[in-house]
């Protein structure tokens, strides 16, 4: 009997210890740790709201988002209060050395070019945070990896994005652009002019361009995959705006079920496509047909495994995750660049004419070629200015793995560092009093001339983790603009509503209605 009582006491004590440990961890997570970090940050000279239990700044941020996103803007209005209302408000209230709260997690805002350079160059000390219940939607493959795993993936994927491979992909871009422009010509054939929502066309075009370039002859299957992934991205954006509750992704909700279904279906389709192309490689498919990215990625992976052993290559799951990451970045960034370039040139007819003159001198009525596109100076200036004003990626985040001592301050372990690229691109201290104006001439001497050597232009990030698809995206944009301006002029429709909106990238909330005229 005594032994039974003793066992019960031991069990009860153990149970109480577990409960107390859980309570301690919960109290530390929701209160003690945030207050400790707040004290640390204020000692380092940062300003921000005092921590409010569990919610932090999220309630105020969500309220400001709802108000800001409900109203359109005049064309000449500053759209930062609409795109990033709470962050913009915080910087105005507390200065550029400030912090906000995402639930119990402090977010340090960094806008100083020298500090940005430190953070971007020391990427191993500032990995991407894993805060949130649905990170896999936005952070997969190369976008998600750190350390040696990132280096391994980057090394294997790099050959697919080299200039010689991009040259072979250009015909795929050309075919997709032709299809869209032929549709425009049919629609405008009666009157020579028509109104359309350019956002829808740009979104569909970049999807088709990416599918053709990525999957070659299997591009129609690629389009189906991208449609599923777009649904997953839309679901993920809803999750981001909700309060993060640890473990919530495992709850049997309709939302979570649909996310799992899209993930399963997408991976199954990627798997089938990858296995088909791997068979082509085994059969010795010639390099003269090496005209799609997936084949190039798999060929590079196969070569690495042969030369360095099986552990040096990427698994099937790795390859699928890298394909997902490339679509997420490629589709959304490029479609955003396309549409805002059309909007900007519709507002600024003088620059539209300058671009058309340059394109005409380079190609006449012929199809644009790689060499000619690489020498388009005015077009490149325009694209850089659009990337500055309407940066597709409007912010990015890092987190400190340990206490980090930077030149101007120190950060404790576990602090999220938010880099608001859009705010940096609109900072008058860095770009001058004309920062809100569309002035491509600021890039006449390239990015280095425009930034005066400071790290203040970050549309594709910077440092070792600069976007692997930067040249890919710029090639798409140059070809798109050249082929459009060879055939059409564009202007804003009276029904155009100016409403930049923060989704996966900066996109027009109510579309981008333009009038196109055949030349």
UniProtKB/Swiss-Prot annotation:
GO molecular function: heme binding; iron ion binding; monooxygenase activity; oxidoreductase activity, acting on paired donors, with incorporation or reduction of molecular oxygen
Subcellular location: Membrane
Tissue spec. comment: Expressed in hypocotyls, roots, cotyledons, stamens and silique junctions.
Main location: membrane
Any single Pfam family the record assigns to this protein: p450
Domain of life: Eukaryota
EC number: 1.14.-.-
Any coiled-coil regions, as ranges: none
CDD domains associated with the record: CYP72
Induction line: By brassinolide (BL), auxin and dark treatment.
Keywords: Growth regulation, Heme, Iron, Membrane, Metal-binding, Monooxygenase, Oxidoreductase, Transmembrane, Transmembrane helix
One GO cellular component term noted in the UniProt record for this chain: membrane
Annotated heme binding sites: 467
Membrane-spanning residues: 10-30
Disruption outcome: No visible phenotype under normal growth condition, but increased length of dark-grown hypocotyls, reduced responsiveness of hypocotyls to light and increased responsiveness to brassinolide (BL).
Membrane-related topology note: Single-pass membrane protein
Essential cofactor(s): heme
Main function: Atypical cytochrome P450 involved in brassinosteroids (BRs) inactivation and regulation of BRs homeostasis. Acts in association with CYP734A1 to inactivate BRs and modulate photomorphogenesis.
Miscellaneous: The gain-of-function mutant shk1-D (T-DNA tagging) shows a severe dwarf phenotype and an important reduction of the levels of the BRs castasterone (CS), 6-deoxocastasterone (6-deoxoCS) and 6-deoxotyphasterol (6-deoxoTY). The gain-of-function mutant chi2 show reduced length of hypocotyls grown in red, far-red and blue lights or darkeness. The gain of function mutant dlf1-D shows severe dwarf phenotype with low fertility.
Record family assignment: Belongs to the cytochrome P450 family.
Identification of the protein by name: Cytochrome P450 72C1
Source organism per UniProt: Arabidopsis thaliana
Gene coding for it: CYP72C1
